[in-house]
């Protein structure tokens, strides 16, 4: 039985001090067509990318760079324009084997994308060059992100004020009010800076931007590969532009009916399960880490380490919130486990904080930009509860139920949406008919960020899709990634190469065994480097 931290029943949070902002009313403006009349095809002037990009450094070397002007507001196609930053890795196969363009999205929302073509074109992610060479790979920074203009970044103190933040888990009403005021300030600052832009930052407009890219490239259809949030973007595009999809891979699939408040509640139980799997793995290797022979014993040591930094933050910078952040990636992927287990053992057993210092990084401008777009898109895509009592009740209940690892971290990560200066919109209706878009879904069974139910929901909504399930799979972003699952990679490569997909059957259409968990005693058994294609998005 887990030892749970009791949370107060908040009857007197003092919410009168915290006005909720605009009511979550449905927008009254007329619906905008998928691609309104009057939106003309723009043009892209490609040129070699600089060896050192002002935003992404050396990540774009060897690619072609370009920009595309698109409407800020698609209901006013001749109005204000914004600029999308793009990259391209051109096909190297003979023209008679050319298969068109593939647009790429790593997730988020808020993930940059201009670096992605290199790994797909060169095969460094496991895609055979015999397939990768037949496509033009297109990376793009979505509206507001990284190299696109305007680029958003709001109150930097919300993510990190230069010192340890308050504990994520509020033990008193006063502690909860501190986080609420921080969230309110963040939302207000975004409104002050970008009030005329925020209403146009949403997934439907990013899908329209993708179709504008297609038109500018002169392509009748696109291919697409999206991870995590990129699966929701792909689902939206396929629903808005079903005749424009040639092939589409969606890996680690978002549940569309949950966007976005319910989706985040879904995550809390899923992250708890994944944390338990990590703790059980550490216990299995007690001969290496000495943190306990059971998952519960390891978990107790994890919270013991958190109590130490709560009492005395490391360097005044790493408190319980930052400590939790350091270990959250273990719920996204297995290949961080050896390093993070050592970090935990060093801190709890020996008081050595060097590993925590190395793993903790103060958010840079890209992280601030990514978070600004995460909130801008999520808060605008759909309605969120504007009464904090609902948030408090839901997250307190989940915490009491034993979901202690991420629940309040997740609450505060999304809390600005309770105060966002523009109301949430109406989500795109997702789905296609029996003869709809040609989609391949890839889903790890134990994915925490996008729980497995989302893949089955999208599979039902697109009867023409095929679903490959990685049984026991734990790594968010399972194919063409550091997960290195040859079965999944083979199915995806076959699909991109020739269009072949598994035959349709009830439930999942094909299965792959999970990639084995790491063995810390194997030669050179250190954690694989974190590939930025799989940075935690979709929190």
Feature map (PLM): residue ranges:
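Short beta-strand/loop motif that positions the catalytic acidic residue
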Residues: 435, 440-443
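Catalytic histidine-centered segment of alpha/beta-hydrolase-like enzymes
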Residues: 474-486
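Catalytic histidine neighborhood in serine/cysteine hydrolases
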Residues: 86, 462-477
